[in-house]
Amino acid sequence: MVSFVQLVVQIREIFEHKMVDVDEVMKLMGSYKSDINEWRRFAIFDMNKYTRNLVDIGNGKYNLMILCWGPGMASSVHDHTDAHCFVKILDGELTETKYDWPKKKHTPLETIENKTYGLNGVSYMNDELGLHRMENQSHSNGAVSLHLYIPPYSTCNAFDERTGKKTKCTVTFYSKYGEKIDYHGSKEGK
């Protein structure tokens, strides 16, 4: 079993190499047993939206972040702009819905799979597997998840589930290294 700090260090060591070994990363993410005392300072919630809180930029090779989900909050259906996406549940439960890429304009997205991940569950996603949405289906409890994106990305595409329409989105952080970012007047935060 590894601590949160050891997990961050070992992820950095893995990505000193050029190739992403999905199985190795999944095993490492699975070896960490969530301890709120180790990651609490990075978990900053907002009552109106889910938050993306940066933990480590991995020398520009990846982003490691903690996402905080209030009751009933969900991401849009989105791609990963050719990045690998690993998710570890640190607290609560999240439901991942995977979709096929839109086949025609103005048609609903087709669901491939629905799966709920509980405490310490780990999932993997990339664009070859389709699109996905993460959702906290609880109406009373929050959820916290650790996300690893290789390579890091600053934009992605969101998809309308009813029509398949694609919209390019800028990806921002709510906090960096445990400190909330003040975007007042910043174009990045809008």
UniProtKB/Swiss-Prot annotation:
Organism name: Caenorhabditis briggsae
EC numbers, comma separated: 1.13.11.20
Domain of life (superkingdom): Eukaryota
Keywords on record: Dioxygenase, Iron, Metal-binding, Oxidoreductase, Thioether bond
Family that this chain belongs to: Belongs to the cysteine dioxygenase family.
Residues at which Fe cation binds: 78, 80, 132
Top-level EC class: oxidoreductase
Catalytic activities: L-cysteine + O2 = 3-sulfino-L-alanine + H(+)
PTM comment, free text: The thioether cross-link between Cys-85 and Tyr-149 plays a structural role through stabilizing the Fe(2+) ion, and prevents the production of highly damaging free hydroxyl radicals by holding the oxygen radical via hydroxyl hydrogen.
Molecular functions per Gene Ontology: cysteine dioxygenase activity; ferrous iron binding
Gene that specifies this protein: cdo-1
Gene3D superfamilies linked to this entry: Jelly Rolls
Cofactor, how bound (note): Binds 1 Fe cation per subunit.
Pfam family, one: CDO_I
Pathway as given in its UniProt record: Organosulfur biosynthesis; taurine biosynthesis; hypotaurine from L-cysteine: step 1/2
One GO term of the biological process aspect: L-cysteine catabolic process
Obligatory cofactor(s): Fe cation
Cross-link 3'-(S-cysteinyl)-tyrosine (Cys-Tyr) mapped to chain: 85-149
Protein name: Cysteine dioxygenase
